């Protein structure tokens, strides 16, 4: 576990924020440090964006924000911790909505309800994954990769950030649509998977942009495509996987959530302040440096999108054949 402490605060996720607090309490919020749980190892996209948001809140509100890394069990450990915390605005969750949605489809029994136990605070980003390969792999396009995988069934290994995570789902969806078989090697987070790709331990990783972009520029990793349905403005030269495999579309969403029953007034303050940060022209460049695009949304709009994503990703997880190790 690693914690980063900033002079400010952040929030987590819930379909209904039923409880309310006196107006003066909401206006004085926060009056003590806030803990922002990140269910991923340090060094990844979620960790980076959480620290940017935490730093902003601390500066604006004059309270510490502790960014608390709690990886494990495909984000379930961190999610459970937040779900069972009081809905008072002092325990928040920086979550990968796609992983949240995937878990809802993969696990028959979770220690929390992905909808009922969280309330939306603010969207943070949307970004493609990058279909990345080791330079030694003789494939320079998605079509060539599909042909190579068909010629070597079960012999080409891909790395992921863990079974049931978005990197795993992206690869398994690719396998199903392409009609190929590849070996899955799960790691404890995205950074170790990229390290394995650099070392040649695996041949393929569907990676976050920030984790592979420097290595793509240096030639140590070859990028073949983006996982979104359209080209990304961040990587305009890369075609979508869907150009070769119609229907392929995997988007990495990030969001701030809070425990259920967090008062609407507090959710509103958090949403307004985080959206104010993301509305700055300078923030667009910061997000782009992390390979992400800013997404601004109100809590009610977020809740609708969140439920749609859970339904979509649950279906993808089932159809792709992702299996828990």
Q: Where are each of the predicted segments found?
A:
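Residue-level signal for nonpolar/aromatic packing positions in well-ordered secondary structure
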Residues: 34-36, 43, 50, 67, ...
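A ligand-binding cleft/hinge motif common to bilobed small-molecule-binding domains
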Residues: 98-109, 168, 173-177, 204-237, ...
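An extracytoplasmic/periplasmic, membrane-proximal ligand-sensing/linker region
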Residues: 31-33, 176-177, 217, 264-325
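Bacterial N-terminal signal peptides
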Residues: 4-15
